[in-house]
């Protein structure tokens, strides 16, 4: 890392290729179809010898996991003490390119605030038709959004949302 810290990182390319190929072979993914894509880091508590303390104060791992619908399409493991932003752009690029090589197209990509950076937005925009990346909480952004006029209530998939165009 830029700070001089050392992290263990496993991109598991062969296993991720096998995973996507198995999903195609079993018909769980179909080439030339569009899918919704989700990415997040999961914290897995474990007492294995190589596990490290996470910022959540337990020993474990924090792999980045990508799903399409209800199937996992990519996993890259990292130390529990690795910042979620560390090489996340590289992780997502590998996963998106693996799916594109299999002719799997991403309609909508969703990620949490760990993916909120200009570089991530630019990269995700290249690999999906639409995307949602939750912004980091920030007082000035909250104030700007609160000041917007024209909010309206919409129901999407049975859930009520307040929406407004910027």
What residue ranges belong to the model's regions?
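Active-site-proximal, Lys/Arg-enriched surface segment
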Residues: 1-65
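Domain-level cores of phosphate- or acyl-group-handling catalytic modules
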Residues: 84-142
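Short acidic, glycine/serine/threonine-rich loops at helix termini
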Residues: 47-53, 73-77, 111, 118-124, ...
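Short acidic, glycine/Ser/Thr-rich loop/turn "cap" segments at secondary-structure junctions
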Residues: 1-7, 45-47, 73-81, 104-108
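Short, structured patches in soluble enzyme cores that scaffold and shape functional sites
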Residues: 41, 76-79, 113, 135, ...
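An anionic, glycine-rich sequence signature occurring as long contiguous blocks
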Residues: 130-166
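Electropositive, glycine- and tryptophan-enriched low-complexity nucleic-acid-binding patches
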Residues: 55-102
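Short, conserved catalytic/metal-binding motifs centered on acidic residues
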Residues: 1, 35-43, 70, 106-116, ...
